[in-house]
């Protein structure tokens, strides 16, 4: 099954993925790899002397144009069974079989990225980045667990030649194992993950940062603990991007992974650091203009879960516009009566945070709705006094 254009463009309260719980493999909504696409080695030669910003723009262009190997477009189902407060839950989520790469199954290049670029791709492909707990779960479920291949630290570890060197070390292991890169198997041990974490926005750093974790030597034995000391523009050879479908199944019903991470009763399924109210990285200014080059990209607009949630009495609503649009953001009660319009007018492409002060309203469930051109999406929030 493949993510449909309509499904990933218009997300509503009731999410209807065009696959079922019986599908063990699904695919990213990107084009088939073009016949004339660059190989991994050719792409390395093209970007090795570029600035990091121009390199990341080139990376996004290649990936959204479909120039990725099969393991970077296939997502495999993982099932979690857990009891919470006496209730039994079965969650099925979908993870890329391996980290993002550019090229073919035979000639590919694992490409480290900054977190904003990884988030840009996730947003455009209806995906999310993993949490620490999800990284552990994915590794434990990996059919092939490779030995990490560290390269001695140096000033060149953030350069394309060292990225390419590390890709070669990983390929050697696959060749020695006789592993078929087109197989439907999850691979672990190849990279550290860029993860979603409360440490993205924590007060222990006064700068935007990337949070990394993983590179397991074995079960419960990662080389890299959770770390948020690197600036957001840092990416070295050991960093990898493994996308997770934002659409999943909980007890047979379709859900969003992002919503699970922000819900008081469910976060424990996928997080071991509590609720993650902002399960995403800040947008990158230098990538915003790229949306105009991908008119058929799956997501033009996105409404995220408010934070905090539950809240008392103020909360923040975040949404993303990939192009200029006439926008209306309103709050309704459960009877469908409009209580307040928070935004009304034309806005440029970008990421927006809108505060709502519910001081004059009673405790309860409220609905906030975003309209932007032909897009419309609603979410629920809880005022708890």
Which residues are covered by each model-predicted region?
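Extracellular adhesion/carbohydrate-recognition regions
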Residues: 80-112
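Conserved hydrophobic ligand-interaction patch in extracellular adhesion modules
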Residues: 115-185, 243
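Disulfide-stabilized, aromatic/cysteine-rich ligand-recognition loop
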Residues: 109-113, 127, 215-287, 382
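Bacterial Sec-dependent N-terminal signal peptides
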Residues: 1-9, 290, 320, 374
């Amino acid at each position: 099954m493949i993510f449909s254009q309509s499904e990933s463009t218009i997300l509503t309260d009731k999410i209807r993925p065009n696959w079922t719980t019986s599908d063990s493999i699904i695919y990213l909504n990107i084009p088939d790899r073009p016949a004339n696409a660059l190989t991994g080695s050719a792409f390395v030669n093209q970007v090795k002397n570029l600035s990091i910003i121009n390199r990341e723009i080139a990376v996004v262009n290649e990936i959204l144009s479909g120039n990725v190997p099969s393991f970077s477009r296939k997502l495999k189902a993982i099932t979690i069974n857990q009891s919470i407060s006496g209730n039994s839950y079965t969650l099925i989520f979908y993870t890329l079989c391996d980290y993002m790469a550019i090229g073919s199954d035979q000639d590919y290049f694992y490409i480290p990225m900054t977190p904003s670029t990884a988030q840009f791709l996730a947003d455009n492909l209806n995906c999310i980045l993993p949490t620490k707990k999800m990284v552990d779960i994915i590794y434990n479920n990996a059919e092939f667990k490779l030995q990490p291949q560290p390269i001695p630290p140096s000033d060149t570890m953030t350069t394309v030649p060292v990225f390419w060197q590390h890709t070669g070390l990983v390929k050697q292991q696959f060749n020695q194992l006789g592993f078929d890169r087109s197989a439907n198997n999850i691979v672990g041990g190849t990279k550290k993950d860029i993860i979603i974490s409360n440490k993205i926005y924590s007060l222990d750093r006064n700068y935007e940062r990337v949070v990394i974790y993983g590179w397991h030597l074995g079960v419960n034995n990662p080389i890299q603990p959770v770390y948020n000391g690197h600036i957001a523009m840092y990416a070295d050879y050991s960093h990898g991007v493994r996308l997770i479908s934002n659409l999943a199944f909980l007890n047979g019903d379709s859900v969003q992974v992002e919503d699970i991470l922000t819900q008081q009763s469910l976060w424990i399924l996928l997080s071991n650091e509590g609720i993650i109210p902002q399960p995403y990285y800040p947008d990158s200014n230098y990538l915003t203009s790229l949306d105009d080059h991908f008119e058929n990209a799956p997501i033009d607009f996105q409404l995220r879960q408010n934070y905090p949630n539950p809240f008392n009495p103020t909360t923040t609503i975040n949404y993303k516009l990939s192009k200029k649009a006439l926008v209306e953001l309103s709050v309704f009660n459960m009877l469908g009566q409009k209580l307040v319009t928070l935004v009304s007018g034309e806005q440029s492409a970008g990421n927006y945070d809108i505060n709502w002060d519910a001081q004059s309203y009673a405790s309860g469930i409220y609905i906030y709705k975003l309209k932007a051109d032909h897009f419309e999406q609603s979410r629920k929030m809880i005022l708890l006094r």
